């Protein structure tokens, strides 16, 4: 018998989040000070984008963009893939695998409530 493990039991929360008008420099500072590799971008608590360390390297550093004049909206990945809070860890694993993601935003009623990472999934599988 396989026990169904729900995402909300293993997700990281609370989640640092930013709005699309924040400067890239401020977003990087939040990521650095919080020791996180992802920042969801929200509007009315609903995820509209996501910024990862990889996004910053590819879209900012490599292109020599001004960190103070560029806002988060200009570098974020729009329409991020989300997963519902009551989905199973197996569903999260499938979504991560199919999309080559290491993180998924967790929503409840369309609003951001957490993040689940590949590391979280590995911890569940090894428990």
Segments from the language model and where they lie:
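Tandem CBS (Bateman) regulatory domains
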Residues: 1-14, 28, 52-82, 88-97, ...
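Short charge-dense sequence patches
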Residues: 2-12, 21-26, 40-47, 102
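Glycine-/small-residue-rich active-site loops that bind phosphorylated ligands and cofactors
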Residues: 16, 23, 48, 81, ...
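The conserved cystathionine-beta-synthase
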Residues: 18-35, 42, 83-100, 107, ...
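A glycine-centered beta-loop-beta connector
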Residues: 31-34, 39-55, 96, 104-119
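Short, charged/polar low-complexity linear motifs in solvent-exposed/disordered segments
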Residues: 35-37, 66-68, 76-77, 86, ...
